[in-house]
A protein has these predicted regions:
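Concave beta-strand-loop units of leucine-rich repeat
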Residues: 1-10, 21-75, 82-138, 145-182, ...
Length: 196
């Protein structure tokens, strides 16, 4: 057993030692984001994550969870989740001013940017998107196209009712001007009902 917990060693130093003494157990503190952590650490909290950080996390063999609710390095978080499937990677994605946990299945939006549409890819459990109101019809079209491409259900809310974008008949009684803008996103719509 090599006890190096009080030595200042890098991951490169550790690799050299491991090659020189492959049958020895090496006890050490892992350098990560400017601090050192016990090799048996099972939970880490991060606010940022680089590709190098993702690789360094491999040294934490006991790691069970990475808490990253304030981290917006989504590509690296997704890479970590793919690289270490046994590690829970907890993060949230902000879309249309709301935070959605990575295991969110349904998202509701009224306004969305191109960047936020791309962020939907970091919600691996996402099965449905609902458009509520329509501040930017062009963006909603892009969102609908994205959903179709990814196999995600796209629906629209009119008043208190939600309809899939494949609806053919719709009652528009009492809907708002913003909701009227959504009608252009219903390519199969054939009949409108309006009372009063």
């Amino acid at each position: 057993v090599l006890d190096l917990r009080f030595a200042d060693i890098t991951t490169a130093d550790y690799e050299k030692l491991r090659k020189k003494a492959p049958n020895s157990e090496i006890l050490w503190r892992i350098p990560f984001q400017g601090k050192t952590y016990d090799q048996n650490t099972d939970v880490l909290y991060v606010t940022s994550l680089t590709d190098e950080d993702v690789a360094t996390l491999d040294y934490f063999t006991q790691l069970k969870s990475v808490e990253a609710q304030e981290c917006t390095d989504y590509a690296q978080l997704a890479a970590l989740a793919a690289r270490r499937p046994a590690v829970a990677v907890d993060y949230a994605v902000t879309i249309d001013g709301r935070k959605y946990d990575q295991d969110t299945a349904v998202v509701s939006v009224s306004d969305i940017t191109d960047e936020e549409i791309n962020l939907l890819t970091y919600l691996p459990e996402l099965t449905a998107v609902t458009a509520v109101g329509c501040e930017t019809p062009e963006q909603m079209e892009k969102l609908r196209d994205f959903c179709q491409e990814k196999g995600i259900s796209f629906a629209l809310r009119f008043g208190t009712k939600t309809y899939p974008d494949t609806v053919q008949e719709l009652d528009v009684t009492g809907i708002t001007d913003a909701e009227l803008e959504l009608l252009q996103l219903l390519p199969e719509l054939k009949t409108l009902h309006l009372v009063n």
